Amino acid sequence: MSAVPAAAQPAPCDDPSCTPGIRPAVVLGAPCTDTAHFVFGTTSWGRLVFCGSPRRYEPRYFRSPSMAGVKEFDASCAGYENWVAQSPDGLFLSCQSNNGAPRWGRGDDA
């Protein structure tokens, strides 16, 4: 019996520059549609924004908190409190404390 080779792990991504699906040329305050997946964009001057719906009003683009790149849902986010991220499948994540432990949770439920 021979050993099965281990699958290669993706390279770490700890900032917006390596995050897939960030939409260019977004207008701050403009309407947007999806507040759950691939929510990030950049303005013409390079500011990172995200599509959000405060208090369930119509979604629009807001200035983004600091972004930690691509992270796994429900993984520890110690050191990234109040930051946002994106899961490998595009889910919007935010670092939330749950029972005293910081974890990456859904950003559209924060």
Where are these regions (language model features)?
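Extracytosolic low-complexity repeat regions of secreted or lipid-anchored proteins
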Residues: 38, 46-110
